[in-house]
Amino acid sequence: MPENATNHLGAPGDGDLAAQVAALPWYHSIDLPGGITTPGVVKNARVLPRYHLPASLAGKTLLDVGAWDGFYSFEAARRGAADVLAADSFSWDGRGWGRKQAFELARRALGFEGVVRDQLIDPTELSPDAIGGQFDVTLLLGVLYHLEDPIGVLRRVAACTGELLVLETESTLNWLPFPAARVFPGAELNGDPTNWYQYNERALKGLLREVGFASTKTVFKYPLYRRFARAARDRFQGKSFRAAFYSSRIILHARKG
């Protein structure tokens, strides 16, 4: 899991917003007015450079699949996107520990209600008809390995994407010279029964081309020292060194043209 975040409560006069923030569970760390940062699990501002998002999204439309608390949807709005659709189901409909109220509170506090729309929709239901057409840019961050039918969802995501897909997911078996995947029955991966698959880099690139993307580029992988440090920590905690060392996160850009 990503590193824990810290929370900075609001300045005098921000008590109402601070209290609302404190009453909700947060996965994303989002800077809100008044010096308030939501107490998220992920330090999003720190990891944001890994994604190599376009510096300007002026005039672009963006689809954020698995938006959760909305950090990346709001970041797209900050970068000038003309229309952002935050889409989620698991984190908003009560199946997960997230709450849609957190997304709505952050959107309202940031003043993005006119730019960032939301839709409760499962990734398996995505289609241009279901979400109102194609989007220039699609974000699929931390979603793919939770899906029972990842290839089917990739086809749906490709149909909804006009230019660029940013994909972030679990990855392993990257030392193999051919496409490969690992399956995790039950709660074998990180103790989470919703974690199903890890693909290696070759497999991800091949699947992205198969579903309709013309080119792919890996923009981030954990360096060796980072994987070793994480594996050593897990071994100290009585967990598997090998599993942690060979598992990683990977971010790819896939383009239509």
What positions do the PLM features span?
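Conserved N-terminal segment of class I S-adenosyl-L-methionine
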Residues: M1-F135, A181, A232-R233, Y246-G257
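Short, contiguous strand/loop micro-motifs
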Residues: T38, G59-T61, L140-L141, N190-D192
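Active-site flanking residues adjacent to catalytic metal/cofactor-binding acidic residues
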Residues: L63, A87, L141, L167-E168
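S-adenosyl-L-methionine-dependent methyltransferase catalytic module, highlighting the catalytic core
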Residues: T124-F135, L139, E148-G257
